[in-house]
Amino acid sequence: MNEALQSAVITGPTGAVGLALCRELLHRGWQVYAVCRPGSARAGRLPQHPNLHKIDCDMSQAAMLPGLIPSGADAMFHLAWGHTMGEGRNDMLAQNENIRYTIEHIRAAAKLGCRVFVGAGSQAEYGRVEGLLQPGTPCFPENGYGMAKLCAGQMTRVEAEKLGMRHIWVRILSVYGPGDNENAMVPSLIRALLRGECPALTAGEQLWDYLYSADAAKALAELAIKGRSGGVYPLGSGRAVPLKEYVETLRDLICPGQPLGFGQRPYAPRQVMHLQADVSALRQDTGYAPATPFAEGAAQTIAWYQENP
């Protein structure tokens, strides 16, 4: 598959992946319809570009999108999802609503004339796995968030078949970059180090796969064009190193010599100790080759947080 696409709807455009995807598609010359929650405080982060059109529409109102985007679009990237952190991940009714909203968005995509739906899944669909995460790795999610993502991916795949659309489901691992959720590890650690604090940390022995947001965005764009319909693609760098090394890199970029509180916090219950994507299917179908070393992406992310305290 190598589909010619020129326009896209992006839900959830103000997070790390969404912002990077907006920039990537604009760089390719696409028309981008960035769907934001009305009154979103983060909408000001969106790139200022004549081909970017901000659409105010709550996630619960997907049926309104065809009327708000009368010109239609070629693709939809559905990144929006509620209750992604903390106790909200096990709010089962809220996660069930996320499933419904995802189904409503693929139906809206069909009415917009979209030929492909790219949905943002999660490594949480797998649960705890020792070894590489592959498209066919059995899924045993351990929280409502992962369960709902798995269900949404399966249900929208069936909807896509009924609607005559291509369907791509991307199980995103750990992406970092400008605009990331401030409660995620990389931004929370950056902010603490910029304040001169000594953050309390686990021992940092987890083997972890981090991917810079710009590389994730390129992968999503290429999957929309070339991805196999019905395909599931784990998305990471394909390389895992001890979490401690990432932390030390951030420290060395911000405040070399600053003490770090390794071992001051216990591991969480059901802590994932090995997170790593097998990107061979992604590479085979799209030519995927992440280009940003962690130190380089981290430096760009730190600069963004210094400009956006």
Task: Identify the role of each PLM range.
Residues 103-144:
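Conserved Rossmann-fold NAD(P)-dependent oxidoreductase catalytic core, especially the SDR/UDP-sugar
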Residues 11, 35, 76-79, 117-123, ...:
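SDR active-site strand-loop-helix element
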